[in-house]
């Protein structure tokens, strides 16, 4: 299957991302670092933010996630729907999804999500949700899964291959992840910034609900 071999080669070219994660040390914290991070996290770097919710919402949540991260998938499937219903759709929260691929397969999936979304946040969140639901086959049968999901969103195999070979997109993805590691001190997934405050690791909806309710009372 020539396409599969070429496609695999394209994915393997993403190995630089995993190298980046391993070798870039976090910047040492300084006085006022938390306020500085809150300012930095508010602005996208290379890729435009994919966000749901009102821009003027009182709370902004930025999530850094990897499409091969089980805790990220659990958040997407079990927590995000309730967050969207109670807070995003009611104008209380603006939710921003940013990529932090922890391996080559997650990087390829992130690139596909960007290509499918093409600047449309609703479409982007739709494919990200599908990729999380298909996480097991994404990890075990990466090529077939990316092609199948791409096909579901109207991309043939040639278009999927072209997407994961897009050097400009890869460079932007790499730059954004480098920024998250160096400037924001993000080290793992999921990492959340809620109005600039970093929260690491998985959260139940009950934990997140309590946090957001407290912020809205201020």
Question: Residue spans of the language-model regions?
Answer:
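Extracytoplasmic thiol/disulfide redox context detector
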Residues: 2-3, 9-102, 174-177, 181-182, ...
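C-terminal cap of thioredoxin/glutaredoxin-like
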Residues: 2-6, 29-35, 40, 64-66, ...
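Residue-level signal for pocket-adjacent positions within structured domains
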Residues: 45-47, 133, 194
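Glycine-rich, flexible loop/turn motifs
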Residues: 48, 108, 160
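Structural alpha/beta surface segment adjacent to cysteine/selenocysteine redox centers
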Residues: 67, 73-151
């Amino acid at each position: 299957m020539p396409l599969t071999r070429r496609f695999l080669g394209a994915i393997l070219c993403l190995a630089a991302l995993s190298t980046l994660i391993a070798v870039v040390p976090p910047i040492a914290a300084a006085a006022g670092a938390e306020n500085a991070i809150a300012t930095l996290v508010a602005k996208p770097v290379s890729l435009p933010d994919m966000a749901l919710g009102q821009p003027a919402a009182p709370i902004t949540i930025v999530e850094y996630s990897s499409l091969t991260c089980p805790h990220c998938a659990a958040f997407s499937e079990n927590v995000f729907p309730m967050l969207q219903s109670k807070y995003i759709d009611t104008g209380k929260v603006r939710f921003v999804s940013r990529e932090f691929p922890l391996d080559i397969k997650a990087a390829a999936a992130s690139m596909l999500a960007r290509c499918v979304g093409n600047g449309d946040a609703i479409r982007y969140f739709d494919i990200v949700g599908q990729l999380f639901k298909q996480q097991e086959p994404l990890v075990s049968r990466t090529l077939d899964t990316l092609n199948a999901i791409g096909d579901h969103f109207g991309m043939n195999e040639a278009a999927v291959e072209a997407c994961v070979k897009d050097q400009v997109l890869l460079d932007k993805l790499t730059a954004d992840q480098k920024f998250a590691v160096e400037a924001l001190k993000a080290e793992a997934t999921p990492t959340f910034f809620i109005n600039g405050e970093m929260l690491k690791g998985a959260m139940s909806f009950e934990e997140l609900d309590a946090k957001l309710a407290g912020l809205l009372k201020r």
